[in-house]
Amino acid sequence: MIDYIKGELTFLSPTYAVIEAAGVGYQINIALTSYSALVGNEGQVTKLLVTEIIREDTHDLFGFFTAGERELFVMLMTVSGIGANTARMIMSAYTAAEIRQIIATGNARALSQVKGLGPKTAQRIIV
């Protein structure tokens, strides 16, 4: 398992970043909150904590600035009906602190406003 990747940020888009480390360019999926934090850092050494998702047809890396963001991402994926891309969409719509507050207050309505997330799945996140 890969814990983090540190290297030169060579490319940045709202959905992914490329970090070159030891001559290898790693495409790392990111949330919009991470994108906002990375804007202006292209060409600089950057460190992202990562979670690696390995499936039959793909190996994906998802990057985070803090351990708390990564823990929240992993926790969201334990909910039935939530995959890595849906978890990333949730984390693009709200900050980690906002998501924790939404869950703590039981505000399934706020979660169901995220694209691709219906009311039943939003309720499962709350529970």
Predicted regions and their residues:
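Glycine- and Gly-Pro-enriched alpha-helical subdomains that act as flexible
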Residues: S112-K115, I125
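Amphipathic, charged-and-aliphatic alpha-helical interface segments
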Residues: E52, H59-F64, A84-I103, R124-V127
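Charged, well-structured binding/catalytic surfaces in domain cores that contact anionic ligands
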Residues: T121
